[in-house]
Amino acid sequence: EIKNAQLLVNGKPVLIKGANRHEIDPDGGYVVSVERMIQDIRIMKQLNINAVRTCHYPDDPRWYELCDEYGLYLTAEANLESHGMGYGEKSLAKFPEYLQTHIERNEGNVKSFINHPSIIVWSLGNECGYGINFEKTYDWVKALDKTRPVQYERGGYDSKTDIHCPM
């Protein structure tokens, strides 16, 4: 939860020292072995990293299990990325015909991983502009999971996001 602009986990304030993570391996390419995942976690722990954002899509389900086991916090991001479309009036976030896509991609993320205690924040997507589709998707996620904050990096102070995180 967030209270007085402070992120709390189990009622206690936490200082996030985080990193973004893409599913890519120097040897296996887009196939990341469990051994490499564990190696990554151990390196992060040595560097005092305590949180990871699964940018810009959900990760291999084994990653969430390992984060539960090793005690890494997660911001679990849905696979919404459309920055090539533009952020202004062309943003897909503003077109009603893309609302179902916004919700379905977040539904897949949240319903797949909701039982992982390592997830402390849901992320609606990345660099897709801002509009009514994100407002309605935020409401949908909050209705399904009232226990976790929801963020969207294009959401400002007057937007539907629990965490202000501008790029």
Task: Annotate the PLM regions.
Residues E1-M44, E65:
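N-terminal carbohydrate-binding accessory modules
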Residues I41-M44, A51-M167:
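Substrate-binding/catalytic cleft of secreted carbohydrate-active enzymes
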